[in-house]
Protein backbone atom coordinates (compact mmCIF):
# COMPACT_ATOMS: atom_id res chain seq x y z
CA UNK A 1 0.00 0.00 0.00
CA UNK A 2 1.03 3.57 -0.66
CA UNK A 3 -0.47 6.90 0.28
CA UNK A 4 -4.10 7.84 -0.30
CA UNK A 5 -5.16 9.76 -3.45
CA UNK A 6 -5.97 13.44 -3.41
CA UNK A 7 -9.77 13.66 -3.64
CA UNK A 8 -11.59 16.59 -2.03
CA UNK A 9 -14.68 14.71 -0.92
CA UNK A 10 -16.07 17.55 1.17
CA UNK A 11 -15.81 20.03 -1.70
CA UNK A 12 -17.53 17.63 -4.10
CA UNK A 13 -20.43 17.11 -1.68
CA UNK A 14 -20.74 20.87 -1.23
CA UNK A 15 -20.95 21.29 -5.01
CA UNK A 16 -23.76 18.74 -5.19
CA UNK A 17 -25.77 20.69 -2.62
CA UNK A 18 -25.07 24.09 -4.20
CA UNK A 19 -25.82 23.07 -7.80
CA UNK A 20 -28.74 20.67 -7.13
CA UNK A 21 -28.04 18.53 -10.22
CA UNK A 22 -30.84 16.65 -11.95
CA UNK A 23 -30.10 12.92 -11.88
CA UNK A 24 -32.03 10.81 -14.39
CA UNK A 25 -32.61 7.37 -12.89
CA UNK A 26 -33.48 4.41 -15.07
CA UNK A 27 -33.51 1.97 -12.22
CA UNK A 28 -35.21 -1.07 -10.75
CA UNK A 29 -38.64 -1.17 -9.19
CA UNK A 30 -37.29 -2.52 -5.89
CA UNK A 31 -35.07 0.44 -5.04
CA UNK A 32 -36.55 3.24 -7.15
CA UNK A 33 -38.47 5.08 -4.42
CA UNK A 34 -35.58 4.99 -1.97
CA UNK A 35 -33.16 6.18 -4.64
CA UNK A 36 -35.44 9.15 -5.26
CA UNK A 37 -35.59 9.90 -1.52
CA UNK A 38 -31.81 9.60 -1.24
CA UNK A 39 -31.21 11.93 -4.18
CA UNK A 40 -33.27 14.61 -2.46
CA UNK A 41 -31.64 13.95 0.92
CA UNK A 42 -28.16 14.70 -0.42
CA UNK A 43 -29.28 17.90 -2.15
CA UNK A 44 -29.75 16.76 -5.74
CA UNK A 45 -32.95 16.36 -7.77
CA UNK A 46 -34.26 13.01 -9.05
CA UNK A 47 -36.28 12.13 -12.10
CA UNK A 48 -37.34 8.52 -12.48
CA UNK A 49 -38.61 7.06 -15.74
CA UNK A 50 -38.37 3.85 -17.74
CA UNK A 51 -40.36 5.10 -20.72
CA UNK A 52 -38.68 4.71 -24.09
CA UNK A 53 -40.85 7.50 -25.48
CA UNK A 54 -39.19 10.15 -23.32
CA UNK A 55 -35.75 8.68 -22.65
CA UNK A 56 -33.89 10.92 -25.11
CA UNK A 57 -35.63 14.04 -23.80
CA UNK A 58 -34.83 13.12 -20.22
CA UNK A 59 -31.15 12.66 -21.01
CA UNK A 60 -31.14 16.06 -22.68
CA UNK A 61 -32.27 17.86 -19.52
CA UNK A 62 -30.37 15.74 -17.00
CA UNK A 63 -26.98 16.53 -15.48
CA UNK A 64 -26.16 12.84 -15.07
CA UNK A 65 -27.72 9.53 -16.10
CA UNK A 66 -27.85 6.32 -14.04
CA UNK A 67 -28.84 3.09 -15.78
CA UNK A 68 -29.54 0.21 -13.41
CA UNK A 69 -30.80 -3.03 -15.00
CA UNK A 70 -32.16 -4.60 -11.82
CA UNK A 71 -35.69 -5.31 -13.10
CA UNK A 72 -35.41 -5.59 -16.89
CA UNK A 73 -38.38 -5.60 -19.26
CA UNK A 74 -38.84 -5.06 -22.97
CA UNK A 75 -39.97 -1.46 -22.48
CA UNK A 76 -37.27 -0.67 -19.93
CA UNK A 77 -34.53 -2.24 -22.03
CA UNK A 78 -35.50 -0.17 -25.08
CA UNK A 79 -35.57 2.95 -22.94
CA UNK A 80 -32.12 2.24 -21.49
CA UNK A 81 -30.59 1.70 -24.91
CA UNK A 82 -32.16 4.91 -26.18
CA UNK A 83 -30.84 6.81 -23.17
CA UNK A 84 -27.36 5.36 -23.57
CA UNK A 85 -27.14 6.32 -27.24
CA UNK A 86 -28.39 9.82 -26.44
CA UNK A 87 -25.97 10.26 -23.55
CA UNK A 88 -23.10 9.26 -25.81
CA UNK A 89 -24.20 11.69 -28.53
CA UNK A 90 -24.68 14.59 -26.12
CA UNK A 91 -21.65 13.83 -23.96
CA UNK A 92 -23.73 13.49 -20.79
CA UNK A 93 -22.05 11.71 -17.87
CA UNK A 94 -23.54 8.24 -17.46
CA UNK A 95 -23.17 5.32 -15.05
CA UNK A 96 -24.03 1.68 -15.67
CA UNK A 97 -25.01 -0.59 -12.79
CA UNK A 98 -25.24 -4.11 -14.30
CA UNK A 99 -27.32 -5.60 -11.49
CA UNK A 100 -27.41 -9.38 -11.65
CA UNK A 101 -25.11 -9.53 -14.66
CA UNK A 102 -24.42 -13.17 -15.45
CA UNK A 103 -27.60 -14.48 -13.81
CA UNK A 104 -29.53 -14.78 -17.11
CA UNK A 105 -28.88 -14.50 -20.83
CA UNK A 106 -31.24 -11.52 -20.96
CA UNK A 107 -29.09 -9.53 -18.52
CA UNK A 108 -25.86 -10.53 -20.24
CA UNK A 109 -27.13 -9.47 -23.66
CA UNK A 110 -28.59 -6.21 -22.35
CA UNK A 111 -25.38 -5.19 -20.58
CA UNK A 112 -23.29 -6.03 -23.63
CA UNK A 113 -25.54 -3.91 -25.86
CA UNK A 114 -25.41 -1.02 -23.40
CA UNK A 115 -21.62 -1.15 -23.15
CA UNK A 116 -21.33 -1.21 -26.94
CA UNK A 117 -22.76 2.32 -27.02
CA UNK A 118 -19.61 3.66 -25.34
CA UNK A 119 -21.75 5.94 -23.20
CA UNK A 120 -20.48 5.02 -19.74
CA UNK A 121 -17.61 6.75 -18.01
CA UNK A 122 -18.32 4.79 -14.83
CA UNK A 123 -19.37 1.17 -14.34
CA UNK A 124 -20.22 -0.05 -10.83
CA UNK A 125 -21.30 -3.40 -9.50
CA UNK A 126 -20.66 -5.91 -6.76
CA UNK A 127 -17.63 -8.16 -6.82
CA UNK A 128 -19.36 -10.95 -8.72
CA UNK A 129 -20.78 -8.68 -11.40
CA UNK A 130 -17.50 -6.86 -11.98
CA UNK A 131 -15.59 -10.15 -12.06
CA UNK A 132 -17.92 -11.53 -14.73
CA UNK A 133 -17.59 -8.34 -16.77
CA UNK A 134 -13.84 -8.78 -16.50
CA UNK A 135 -14.19 -12.23 -18.02
CA UNK A 136 -13.65 -14.14 -14.80
CA UNK A 137 -15.89 -16.93 -13.53
CA UNK A 138 -18.03 -16.20 -10.50
CA UNK A 139 -21.33 -17.54 -9.25
CA UNK A 140 -24.20 -15.07 -9.17
CA UNK A 141 -27.40 -15.93 -7.30
CA UNK A 142 -30.14 -13.35 -7.82
CA UNK A 143 -28.41 -10.00 -7.61
CA UNK A 144 -25.96 -10.95 -4.85
CA UNK A 145 -22.36 -11.95 -5.36
CA UNK A 146 -21.81 -15.49 -4.10
CA UNK A 147 -18.14 -15.81 -4.88
CA UNK A 148 -15.59 -14.01 -6.99
CA UNK A 149 -11.90 -13.80 -7.78
CA UNK A 150 -10.07 -10.78 -6.33
CA UNK A 151 -12.31 -7.79 -6.99
CA UNK A 152 -9.36 -5.42 -7.21
CA UNK A 153 -7.99 -7.21 -10.26
CA UNK A 154 -11.46 -7.42 -11.78
CA UNK A 155 -12.05 -3.68 -11.36
CA UNK A 156 -8.76 -2.89 -13.07
CA UNK A 157 -9.58 -5.25 -15.93
CA UNK A 158 -13.06 -3.80 -16.48
CA UNK A 159 -11.66 -0.27 -16.48
CA UNK A 160 -9.16 -1.26 -19.16
CA UNK A 161 -11.66 -3.30 -21.16
CA UNK A 162 -14.33 -0.60 -21.37
CA UNK A 163 -12.18 2.53 -21.07
CA UNK A 164 -13.99 3.69 -17.97
CA UNK A 165 -13.73 3.98 -14.21
CA UNK A 166 -14.79 0.71 -12.61
CA UNK A 167 -16.05 0.30 -9.05
CA UNK A 168 -16.47 -3.08 -7.34
CA UNK A 169 -18.37 -2.88 -4.07
CA UNK A 170 -18.33 -5.35 -1.21
CA UNK A 171 -16.81 -5.76 2.25
CA UNK A 172 -13.98 -3.73 0.74
CA UNK A 173 -14.67 -1.32 -2.12
CA UNK A 174 -12.32 -1.08 -5.10
CA UNK A 175 -12.13 1.66 -7.73
CA UNK A 176 -9.82 1.59 -10.74
CA UNK A 177 -8.99 3.76 -13.74
CA UNK A 178 -7.30 0.86 -15.51
CA UNK A 179 -3.84 1.72 -14.23
CA UNK A 180 -4.32 2.24 -10.52
CA UNK A 181 -6.57 0.48 -8.03
CA UNK A 182 -7.80 2.10 -4.82
CA UNK A 183 -9.32 0.31 -1.85
CA UNK A 184 -11.69 1.55 0.86
CA UNK A 185 -12.35 -0.51 3.97
CA UNK A 186 -15.25 1.17 5.72
CA UNK A 187 -18.75 -0.17 5.09
CA UNK A 188 -20.77 -1.57 7.99
CA UNK A 189 -21.95 -5.17 7.71
CA UNK A 190 -25.61 -4.11 7.96
CA UNK A 191 -25.35 -2.75 4.43
CA UNK A 192 -25.53 -6.40 3.38
CA UNK A 193 -28.72 -6.91 5.41
CA UNK A 194 -30.85 -4.44 3.45
CA UNK A 195 -31.87 -4.55 -0.19
CA UNK A 196 -30.86 -1.72 -2.46
CA UNK A 197 -27.71 -0.47 -0.74
CA UNK A 198 -25.72 -1.04 -3.92
CA UNK A 199 -28.35 0.92 -5.82
CA UNK A 200 -27.95 3.76 -3.32
CA UNK A 201 -24.24 3.82 -4.14
CA UNK A 202 -25.15 4.28 -7.81
CA UNK A 203 -27.36 7.24 -6.93
CA UNK A 204 -24.57 8.86 -4.91
CA UNK A 205 -22.08 8.30 -7.72
CA UNK A 206 -24.42 9.83 -10.29
CA UNK A 207 -24.96 12.92 -8.16
CA UNK A 208 -21.21 13.34 -7.68
CA UNK A 209 -20.54 12.63 -11.36
CA UNK A 210 -22.64 15.65 -12.27
CA UNK A 211 -20.09 17.95 -10.60
CA UNK A 212 -16.74 16.15 -11.01
CA UNK A 213 -14.82 13.52 -12.96
CA UNK A 214 -15.67 9.79 -12.74
CA UNK A 215 -12.81 8.72 -10.46
CA UNK A 216 -13.38 11.27 -7.68
CA UNK A 217 -17.14 10.82 -8.14
CA UNK A 218 -16.95 7.10 -7.39
CA UNK A 219 -14.54 7.58 -4.50
CA UNK A 220 -16.54 10.40 -2.92
CA UNK A 221 -19.81 8.47 -3.15
CA UNK A 222 -18.38 5.34 -1.54
CA UNK A 223 -16.63 7.39 1.16
CA UNK A 224 -19.98 8.99 1.98
CA UNK A 225 -21.62 5.57 2.15
CA UNK A 226 -18.88 4.25 4.40
CA UNK A 227 -18.92 7.19 6.78
CA UNK A 228 -22.71 7.23 6.97
CA UNK A 229 -22.95 3.49 7.58
CA UNK A 230 -20.66 3.62 10.59
CA UNK A 231 -22.51 6.55 12.16
CA UNK A 232 -25.96 5.14 11.37
CA UNK A 233 -25.06 1.74 12.84
CA UNK A 234 -24.11 3.34 16.15
CA UNK A 235 -27.56 4.92 16.31
CA UNK A 236 -29.54 1.82 15.28
CA UNK A 237 -30.80 -1.41 16.84
CA UNK A 238 -30.68 -3.47 13.66
CA UNK A 239 -31.06 -3.36 9.88
CA UNK A 240 -34.54 -1.78 9.98
CA UNK A 241 -33.63 1.30 11.99
CA UNK A 242 -30.24 1.34 10.26
CA UNK A 243 -31.93 1.76 6.89
CA UNK A 244 -33.87 4.80 8.09
CA UNK A 245 -30.90 6.34 9.88
CA UNK A 246 -28.80 6.08 6.72
CA UNK A 247 -31.01 8.67 5.03
CA UNK A 248 -30.82 11.03 8.01
CA UNK A 249 -27.05 10.70 8.36
CA UNK A 250 -26.33 11.19 4.67
CA UNK A 251 -28.49 14.31 4.77
CA UNK A 252 -26.58 15.61 7.79
CA UNK A 253 -23.20 14.90 6.22
CA UNK A 254 -23.96 16.58 2.91
CA UNK A 255 -25.41 19.63 4.65
CA UNK A 256 -22.17 20.16 6.57
CA UNK A 257 -19.42 17.85 5.28
CA UNK A 258 -16.68 19.73 7.12
CA UNK A 259 -18.15 18.58 10.44
CA UNK A 260 -17.47 14.93 9.59
CA UNK A 261 -14.47 12.73 8.93
CA UNK A 262 -14.38 10.32 6.02
CA UNK A 263 -12.73 6.93 5.62
CA UNK A 264 -9.54 7.06 3.59
CA UNK A 265 -8.79 5.40 0.29
CA UNK A 266 -5.48 3.65 -0.23
CA UNK A 267 -3.63 3.01 -3.47
CA UNK A 268 -2.96 -0.70 -3.98
CA UNK A 269 -0.21 -2.40 -5.90
CA UNK A 270 -2.12 -4.69 -8.26
Swiss-Prot record:
The gene is thiM. This is Hydroxyethylthiazole kinase. Substrate binds at residues 48, 196. It comes from the Bacteria. Its EC number is 2.7.1.50. Pathway: Cofactor biosynthesis; thiamine diphosphate biosynthesis; 4-methyl-5-(2-phosphoethyl)-thiazole from 5-(2-hydroxyethyl)-4-methylthiazole: step 1/1. GO terms for molecular function: ATP binding; hydroxyethylthiazole kinase activity; magnesium ion binding. The keyword Endoplasmic reticulum does not apply. It is an enzyme of class 2 (transferase). Catalyzes the phosphorylation of the hydroxyl group of 4-methyl-5-beta-hydroxyethylthiazole (THZ). It comes from Coprothermobacter proteolyticus (strain ATCC 35245 / DSM 5265 / OCM 4 / BT). HAMAP family: Thz_kinase. Its cofactor is Mg(2+). Keywords: ATP-binding, Kinase, Magnesium, Metal-binding, Nucleotide-binding, Thiamine biosynthesis, Transferase. Belongs to the Thz kinase family. The keyword Metal-binding applies. InterPro entries: Hyethyz_kinase, Ribokinase-like. It catalyses: 5-(2-hydroxyethyl)-4-methylthiazole + ATP = 4-methyl-5-(2-phosphooxyethyl)-thiazole + ADP + H(+). Pfam families: HK. ATP binds at residues 124, 169. GO terms for biological process: thiamine biosynthetic process; thiamine diphosphate biosynthetic process.
Amino acid sequence: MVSQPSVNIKEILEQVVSTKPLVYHMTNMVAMAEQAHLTLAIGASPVMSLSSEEAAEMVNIANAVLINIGTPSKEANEAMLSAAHTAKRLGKPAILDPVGYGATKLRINLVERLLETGAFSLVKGNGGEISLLAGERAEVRGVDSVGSPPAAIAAKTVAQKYNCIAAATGPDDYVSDGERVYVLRSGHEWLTRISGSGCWAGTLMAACLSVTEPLPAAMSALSLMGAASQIAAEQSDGPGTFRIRMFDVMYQITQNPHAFSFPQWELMEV
